[in-house]
Amino acid sequence: VEVLRLLGVVEGNGIGQFNPYAQLTRAEFCKMLVTLMGSSDVLRYKTVTIFPDVRASHWAARYVNYAVRGEKLLAGLPDGTFQPDRAISYGEAVTILMRLLRTDADAASGGIWPEGYIDLAKASGVSAGVELAGGAAISRAQAAQLFVNVLGAKATSSSTDKDGETSTTTRVYNPANCVSRERVTLIALNGNTARVSGGKKNSYDLVRPSSATVLNGLKGDLLFDADGK
């Protein structure tokens, strides 16, 4: 959760609580998804109305519209609505994330939905630690785990050239707001700065202050945007 918070993907409820066991809505999932992608194009979709229940005045309109029309990662329901406040299911979540990773989603969609996507998510590591029935609602904590898994997931896709030769490409997903990373061990100096072991610099200033107790001793990747922050 802390990694996602530093990237701006997750937030508290206004009083500093994450509410890990609360169900995540379709609108909230779209916000997490689009924030992770880090595209500035999302602002263009703020005043667009695609669904009658997600008008331009809706708090999540820009995120829903961009995910649907801008990236075509998901769609509305057969009745033309989006149902932004309905809990998102595990099957819906992994389908969207596998499309984000540009894996062999076309092959998965040829089977019984969402089993093909669930199998892809398991094979790529996206669903590690979160394996549910396709129709089960996911919690905020489970969604956070899925998004953390996406950051390190290896996406595999296949293509066939004009001569009939098939090639497979494997890559690690790298969102627009995370252009580089360093494997480090954090040693907190204060709420604004962390000293590290294994990074290119001895210390880093944090964009979002954290308590020393949260940072101290953590091991993992530092994620950097285009400005090196």
Where are these regions (language model features)?
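N-terminal propeptides
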Residues: 1-228
